[in-house]
């Protein structure tokens, strides 16, 4: 049995042992009657607990089984090769080597790998390039898991030449340099540095990794959540000396295949991270509640930007965001932009009083619901709803801000959100006015958007007019609002994933004086295009494709973008063709991109 298999089996035994009762069974005779007790020691204290007669036999069997497994585990430990001297005392940072790495990586061995894992594998075992590999992205997007998977698949020979270093905020580049020299002198070849951007002097001194250690044959993998820090470094200290792998964007296809969760609604609710309750990774979803979503925005996004700017060019690169940072309002401004990212102009989001566009859209749709029109949202105290929503999201309103937010603030925050891959712009084009252009900004982590939408529903529940409705009426309104939110999010998801998956084509929304095509995919090389409507519905209705069969709209489109080779409605139902319109399941569409 190889050492790796032995270690895995030992871990399984240890888990079984932990499920069985420790200690022994003792018998006591009291007034002529025999009583049995479970005796064990915990934290240097002896404990006893009475064992009922009806469970005595099964409990004794469990005690014996634990003793047998403990003996088996003890024998296996003797089979492990003696660890080579590692001079652990010589390390000043947190370094893991040898058998500790097998234990560290054992639990992820059965996890499915992300598609980008192959790039990491190729770097470790491919031709030496004198470069470092940078694995970066927002929190909980699978970076450390990928490193552990790389360690888990190593053979024993490679593992004994590997080291994992967990960087903390107290570490320095000088201390890390000393430890790397020790590892190099002992023949270590693979070194993984996790959360390396916590080093205050990382950005200014990162050339050390490529120029000294990678150049001498060491395969170095750098990982961290401060994406901007890596981008600043790649532009200067590690220019042309690094390979970048960004983990932030997680398409529906990977969310489904890696986490094993099926359904576009689940992706809308939780998509964006590699964590979901009960599935492989963390114990609870990152976006399971408003509190978790807020914490993620503050730590994974706002802190990411602030920490990287603080460490870059000796705090001289805040540009126009310096006043916001000094007054502790940068987090608030970033949070506000993230919440209102679907607004067309970032400047308006930052300078106008906070308004819920989700609420306005839902009110319009409820009024025109053909089967059960409801105008209840017209009578809701919108000012109170807005105030409660603002409080829930902990966003400073314009009247509370002590610094003026101008175009420079808005533009710079948007630049950094783009660099983090959190936001992406989708073109909106117009016919017949071809010179009129705008953009639609989408969020790459749908779960974050949905968590904030849930806060909107909570604020609605507090409104007196809304609460006066019967339970069935309240439920109907809530479900309709969430459906509208999901519908808007589904459009963003399809547009974003199509744009990323088809770099040689142009993906955009095409608007007319009346109506629009939700998505157009234009192939410049072929001189043709495809037009789409995107619906959250599972049902088919002619109303859904009315624009696709509008002869005037189609003629204008073909004049500008060539023949229309396909007309599609992406929805949640089954594939079929109706009146020349191809209805396609949206999950299958995303799965095959």
Feature locations, PLM:
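N-terminal pre-Walker A segment at the start of P-loop NTPase domains
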Residues: 84-124
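Conserved P-loop NTPase "ATPase switch" module shared by AAA+ and STAND
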Residues: 184-206
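Short regulatory helix/loop adjacent to the ATP-binding pocket of P-loop NTPases
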Residues: 228-242
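Domain-level recognition of nuclease-like catalytic cores that cleave nucleotide substrates
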Residues: 565-593
């Amino acid at each position: 049995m190889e050492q790796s298999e032995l270690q895995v089996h030992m871990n399984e035994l240890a888990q079984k042992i932990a499920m069985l009762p420790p200690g022994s069974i003792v018998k006591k005779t009291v007034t002529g009657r025999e009583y049995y007790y479970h005796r064990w020691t915990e934290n240097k204290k002896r404990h006893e607990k009475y064992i009922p007669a009806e469970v005595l036999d099964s409990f004794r069997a469990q005690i014996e089984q634990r003793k047998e497994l403990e003996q088996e585990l003890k024998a296996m430990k003797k089979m492990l090769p003696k660890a080579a001297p590692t001079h652990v005392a010589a390390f000043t940072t947190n370094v893991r080597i040898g058998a500790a790495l097998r234990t560290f990586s054992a639990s992820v061995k059965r996890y499915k790998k992300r598609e980008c894992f192959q790039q990491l594998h190729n770097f470790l075992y491919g031709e030496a390039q004198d470069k470092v590999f940078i694995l970066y992205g927002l929190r909980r997007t699978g970076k450390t898991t990928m490193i552990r998977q790389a360690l888990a698949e190593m053979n024993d020979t490679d593992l004994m030449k590997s080291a994992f270093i967990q960087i903390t905020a107290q570490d320095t580049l000088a201390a890390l340099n000393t430890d790397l020299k020790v590892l190099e002198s002992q023949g270590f070849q693979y070194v993984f540095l996790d959360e390396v951007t916590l080093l205050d002097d990382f950005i200014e001194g990162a050339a050390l990794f490529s120029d000294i250690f990678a150049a001498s044959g060491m395969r170095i993998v750098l990982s961290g959540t401060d994406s901007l820090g890596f981008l600043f470094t790649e532009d200067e200290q590690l220019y042309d000396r690094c390979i970048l792998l960004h983990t932030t964007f997680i398409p529906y296809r990977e969310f489904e295949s890696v986490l094993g969760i099926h359904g576009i609604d689940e992706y809308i609710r939780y998509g964006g991270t590699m964590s979901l309750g009960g599935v492989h990774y963390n114990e609870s979803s990152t976006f399971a509640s408003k509190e978790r979503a807020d914490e993620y925005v503050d730590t994974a996004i706002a802190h990411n930007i602030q920490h990287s700017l603080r460490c870059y060019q000796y705090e001289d690169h805040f540009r126009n965001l310096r006043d916001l940072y000094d007054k502790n309002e940068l987090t608030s401004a970033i949070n506000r932009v993230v919440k209102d990212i679907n607004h067309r102009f970032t400047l308006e989001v930052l300078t106008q009083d906070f308004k819920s566009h989700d609420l306005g859209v839902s009110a319009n749709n409820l009024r025109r619901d053909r089967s059960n029109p409801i105008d209840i949202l017209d009578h809701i105290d919108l000012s109170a709803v807005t105030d409660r929503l603002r409080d829930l999201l902990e966003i400073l309103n314009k009247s509370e801000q002590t610094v003026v937010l101008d175009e420079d603030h808005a533009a710079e925050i948007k630049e950094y959100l783009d660099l983090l891959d959190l936001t992406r712009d989708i073109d909106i084009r117009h016919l017949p006015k071809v010179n009129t252009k705008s953009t639609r900004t989408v969020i790459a982590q749908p779960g974050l958007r949905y968590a904030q939408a849930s806060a909107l529903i909570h604020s609605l529940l507090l409104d007196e007019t809304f609460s006066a409705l019967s339970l069935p009426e309240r439920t109907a309104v809530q479900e309709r609002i969430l459906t509208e939110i999901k519908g808007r999010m589904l459009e963003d998801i399809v547009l974003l994933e199509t744009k990323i998956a088809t770099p040689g084509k142009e993906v955009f929304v095409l608007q007319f004086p009346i109506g629009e095509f939700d998505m157009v995919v234009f192939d410049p090389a072929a001189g043709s295009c495809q037009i789409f409507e995107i619906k959250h519905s599972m049902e088919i209705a002619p109303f859904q494709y009315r624009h696709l069969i509008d002869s005037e709209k189609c003629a204008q489109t073909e004049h500008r973008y060539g023949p229309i080779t396909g007309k599609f409605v992406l929805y949640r139902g089954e594939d079929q063709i109706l009146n020349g319109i191809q209805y396609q399941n949206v999950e299958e569409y995303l799965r095959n991109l």
